[in-house]
């Protein structure tokens, strides 16, 4: 039995941490006073939004780059400074921030905007059109410039871009207020997939954020580590290792900071005097497992079913691999066993591409000589992680139980 004094010991140990000074500076939503290696991007975005200080509507902007390249941090950094300067000059400038992925639906996106404007929004009961009208009416009674940031905007586009189109036209309904949009996405191809009307409006200004290299990541990690950890809490090789690992994963600074934080938490739990390279490697595996589980949980049913099909199709392969055709055949069998209508091969291939982008699988095209080329797929995370996450879906419980746990994923330990 777990006794209260054991809980007290855990809390007591945490309160007198020898390692952490302020772990909050390693969290994803923390915006530091300085953003190393993003000076050009800060300058460019500041130029885009500067007209707001004159009461003019800034151009809409579209910001894209891979995960962890500083898009959100730079946007918040610039807009906070803009609002401070506007206040000092007596100008009326405000900004709203909505993470579209966290809000999940167009209704919740509009509701979040409305609430930030002081509007009381019922949880349900309104149509999208009525809610949009209420947000517009609220804005029309206000004055000044409003900059709306839609982070991870691709999650809104996937549900259709009608709301996005309406938002790009919002100034047609305003008299005293002005509004502009900043869309942030990880997908460099998203803008091309939009309705031409939305594309021309939202893409008035475009900013591209390149991945950080290992040296830049070391600078970022060193800056945050000096504020997050007590002096001497990190072994000498910790920051170079975290930077090197993150540089291999597309220069993702957010992931690098997560790994450093979790490595510190593992060391703290174990009562270690310092954070070591071993703590870093274990933190990376722990984060991969937790992230993969969260991603799989949020997949639509057929996405989960295709993932289960990868497990089934790759069971007989010593390398844990399967071709697209083998996976689709396994998917059709699973869909049939559940009485579900199957998606097309083209759609299934699209789902595989999305899973690849999310880091759950990896795929590549190989040559089979006179038989031509084919795409082979393998898991990029542990099969156990996939099976455990899929098992949480009651629809798939019976199917998943019949899957083996063979097939070593690429990079798994």
Where do the language-model regions lie?
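A short, basic N-terminal segment
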Residues: 1-58, 412-413
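Mid-core helix/loop region of P-loop NTP-binding domains shared across ATPases and GTPases
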Residues: 2-20, 27, 58, 101-220, ...
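Walker A/P-loop nucleotide-binding motif
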Residues: 56-79
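Conserved catalytic segments around the Walker B and adjacent sensor/switch elements
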Residues: 60-62, 85-101
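Post-Walker A helix-loop "phosphate-sensing" segment adjacent to the P-loop in P-loop NTPases
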Residues: 80-92, 118-122
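AAA+ ATPase "lid" subdomain C-terminal helix
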Residues: 247-253, 261-274, 314-317, 335-336, ...
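Conserved C-terminal helix/linker of AAA+ ATPases
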Residues: 266-289
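Terminal-proximal interaction/regulatory segments of ATP-powered molecular machines
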Residues: 314-413
């Amino acid at each position: 039995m777990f006794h209260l004094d054991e809980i007290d010991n855990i809390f007591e140990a945490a309160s007198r941490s020898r390692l952490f000074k302020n772990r909050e500076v390693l969290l994803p939503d923390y915006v530091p006073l300085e953003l190393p290696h993003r000076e050009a991007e800060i300058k460019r975005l500041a130029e885009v939004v500067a007209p707001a200080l004159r009461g003019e509507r800034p151009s809409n902007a579209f910001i894209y780059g891979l995960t962890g390249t500083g898009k959100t941090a730079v946007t918040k950094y610039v807009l906070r400074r803009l609002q401070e300067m506007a206040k000092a000059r007596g100008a009326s400038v405000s900004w709203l921030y909505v993470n579209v992925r966290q809000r999940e639906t167009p209704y919740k996106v509009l509701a979040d905007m409305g609430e930030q404007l002081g509007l009381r929004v019922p949880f349900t009961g309104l149509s999208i059109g009525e809610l949009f009208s209420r947000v517009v009416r609220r804005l029309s009674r206000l004055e000044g410039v409003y900059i709306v940031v839609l982070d991870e905007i691709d999650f809104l586009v996937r549900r259709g871009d009608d709301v996005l189109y309406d938002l790009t036209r919002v100034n047609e309904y305003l008299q005293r207020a002005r509004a502009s949009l900043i869309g942030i996405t990880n997908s460099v191809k998203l803008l091309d997939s939009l309705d031409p009307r939305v594309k021309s409006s939202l893409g008035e200004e475009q900013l591209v954020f390149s991945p950080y290299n290992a040296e830049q990541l070391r600078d970022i990690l060193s800056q945050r580590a000096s504020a997050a950890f007590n002096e001497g809490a990190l072994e000498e090789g910790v920051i170079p290792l975290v930077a090197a690992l993150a540089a291999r994963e597309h220069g993702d600074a957010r992931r690098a900071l997560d790994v450093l934080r979790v490595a510190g938490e593992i060391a703290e739990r174990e009562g270690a005097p310092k954070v070591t390279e071993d703590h870093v490697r274990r933190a990376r595996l722990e984060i991969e497992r937790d992230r993969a589980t969260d991603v799989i949980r949020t997949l639509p049913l057929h996405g989960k079913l295709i993932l289960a099909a990868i497990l089934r199709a790759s069971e007989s392969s010593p390398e844990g691999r399967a071709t697209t055709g083998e996976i689709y055949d396994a998917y059709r069998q699973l869909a049939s066993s559940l009485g579900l209508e199957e998606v097309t091969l083209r759609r299934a291939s699209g789902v595989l591409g999305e899973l690849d982008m999310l880091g759950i699988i990896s795929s590549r095209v190989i040559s089979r000589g006179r038989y031509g080329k084919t795409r082979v797929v393998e898991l990029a995370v542990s099969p156990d992680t996939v099976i455990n996450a899929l098992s949480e879906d009651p629809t798939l419980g019976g199917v998943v139980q019949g899957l083996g746990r063979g097939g070593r994923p690429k990079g798994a330990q």
